[in-house]
Amino acid sequence: MGKSIPQYLGQLDIRKSVVSLATGAGAIYLLYKAIKAGIKCKPPLCSNSPICIARLAVERERHGRDSGELRRLLNSLECKQDEYAKSMILHSITRCVYLLEAEASACTTDDIVLLGYMLDDKDNSVKTQALNTLKAFSGIRKFRLKIQEHSIKVLELISTIWDTELHIAGLRLLNNLPLPDYVHPQLRRVMPALMEILQSDYILAQVQAVRLLSYLAQKNDLLYDILNCQVHSNFLNLFQPTQSGSLLYEVLVFAERLSEGRNAPHYHVVKWHYNEQSLHESLFGEESRLADRLLALVIHPEEDVQIQACKVIVSLQYPQDLRARPSSCQPSRSYFKNTE
């Protein structure tokens, strides 16, 4: 006689349990071996990887000694290298500057000069990495004046090479430096290029470009050049609610500074003439639709954008010089129709 069905099923359950137990035990054992091997595994002693450089920083701090890594990299940059090697060395130097603060501070202006030479390299990736390295060194006060000497060169690169990564690196560097007055003539020449970058489709580059333009809008001798700069017919698309919140915020800051600048007494008294396709006409002209865009941004999901949109509205309705006067004085023109 064969076994009954209940007996057969019972034995089948026992077999399944045994197999599961064995499989689970095997998996646990393999996991134990993997963890044990990982603990015993020693990383390579020397590497240019970010992990290795971070380890050098920890070791230096722990033992209070100079790792020599940054100096070794700078020295290797003076040797003849191909473009790829130079890019990798510069990338490693940048990381070292951020991680090994004491070693970076011990560098000299000669090192900054060496990095400046890299801006003349024929390869755009080398130029970009050199800009990133100079940006890292610009966080150390004693190097700022020396790095400022390269401002004109950086502006030239931004305006003559259409490369998004280079634009981002160059603009980040410029935004981290106080730009001296002697670069203002060059700034006027590159204004159209900055405006083109702002109107491109690369958010990181756009944000850096508009930050620089916002800074320059506070310079009395550059305000007209910015306002009279030619823009695309769809410039106000930058104020659409669908734009990135970070970009919207920076564009609104830019608009507020332009509005305050053009209404300042020393600027307002002059009869300025603007091109029909100028930034001024796009933002503040009779046919501008900026007011509609601003009202839509007042209900934007991001609070920073809401607040900044309100600031621009206030600056348009009540210019700074009029806000300082007695309440009996009214602005000559309103950008917003009366909804009563």
Swiss-Prot record:
Region (Interaction with TBC1D15): 1-101
The keyword Lipid biosynthesis is annotated on this UniProt entry: no
Domain of life: Eukaryota
Recorded GO CC terms: mitochondrial outer membrane; nucleus
Membrane topology type: Peripheral membrane protein
Tissue: Expressed in testis. Highly expressed in the mid-piece of the elongated and late spermatids. Expressed at higher levels in neuroblastoma tissues and cell lines, than those of normal dorsal ganglia (at protein level). Expressed in breast cancer, colon cancer, hepatocellular carcinoma, lung cancer, pancreas cancer, prostate cancer, renal cancer and gastric cancer, but not in their normal counterparts.
ARM repeats, residue ranges: 100-139, 179-218, 278-318
Subcellular localization(s) per the UniProt record: Nucleus; Mitochondrion outer membrane
One of the protein's GO biological processes: flagellated sperm motility
Principal cellular location given in the protein's record: nucleus
Keywords: Differentiation, Membrane, Mitochondrion, Mitochondrion outer membrane, Nucleus, Repeat, Spermatogenesis
Keyword Aminoacyl-tRNA synthetase: no
One Pfam family of this chain: Arm_2
Record's disease association: Spermatogenic failure 90: An autosomal recessive male infertility disorder due to severely reduced progressive motility of sperm.
PANTHER family the record matches: ARMADILLO REPEAT-CONTAINING PROTEIN 12 (PTHR47144:SF1)
Complexes and interactors: Interacts with TBC1D15, TBC1D21, GK2 and IMMT. Interacts with VDAC2 and VDAC3 in a TBC1D21-dependent manner. Interacts (via ARM domains) with RBBP4.
Reported function: Essential for male fertility and sperm mitochondrial sheath formation. Required for proper mitochondrial elongation and coiling along the flagellum during the formation of the mitochondrial sheath. Facilitates the growth and aggressiveness of neuroblastoma cells. Increases the EZH2 activity and H3K27me3 levels in a RBBP4-dependent manner, and facilitates the enrichment of polycomb repressive complex 2 and H3K27me3 on gene promoters, resulting in transcriptional repression of tumor suppressors affecting the proliferation, invasion, and metastasis of tumor cells.
Record-given protein name: Armadillo repeat-containing protein 12
Organism whose genome encodes this protein: Homo sapiens
Lineage per the UniProt record: Eukaryota, Metazoa, Chordata, Craniata, Vertebrata
